[in-house]
């Protein structure tokens, strides 16, 4: 890999991470968009793992990516299931009303 390719890939990863942060701060009311923004940030971090794994010729980063993507998929499925149940009970999905959960 040339230094230009590494710089471009790291810049692309930074842009993805920044879009995730921006999505969280712009839409503070919608829980689903916040969840997608967090997943986008996790994707950017995994992309960094892939870049440095290829750069250092080490397979640990790629194995770690598979592990984290598996856990992220399970986490997203559980989060969406909780949101669907919350929507059926309350009729609205908003950050303001999530504090009314009892547990």
Swiss-Prot record:
It holds the Pfam family Oxidored_q2. It is a multi-pass membrane protein. It is found in: Mitochondrion membrane. One of its GO terms (cellular component) is NADH dehydrogenase complex. It comes from the Eukaryota. This is NADH-ubiquinone oxidoreductase chain 4L. Its EC number is 7.1.1.2. Keywords: Electron transport, Membrane, Mitochondrion, NAD, Respiratory chain, Translocase, Transmembrane, Transmembrane helix, Transport, Ubiquinone. Disulfide bonds: none annotated. The keyword Translocase applies. The lineage of its organism: Eukaryota, Amoebozoa, Discosea, Longamoebia, Centramoebida. Core subunit of the mitochondrial membrane respiratory chain NADH dehydrogenase (Complex I) that is believed to belong to the minimal assembly required for catalysis. Complex I functions in the transfer of electrons from NADH to the respiratory chain. The immediate electron acceptor for the enzyme is believed to be ubiquinone. It catalyses: a ubiquinone + NADH + 5 H(+)(in) = a ubiquinol + NAD(+) + 4 H(+)(out). GO terms for biological process: ATP synthesis coupled electron transport. The gene is ND4L. Belongs to the complex I subunit 4L family. It is an enzyme of class 7 (translocase). InterPro entries: NADH_UbQ_OxRdtase_chain4L/K (IPR001133), NUOK/Mnh_C1-like (IPR039428). The chain crosses the membrane at residues 6-26, 31-51, 65-85. One of its GO terms (molecular function) is NADH dehydrogenase (ubiquinone) activity.
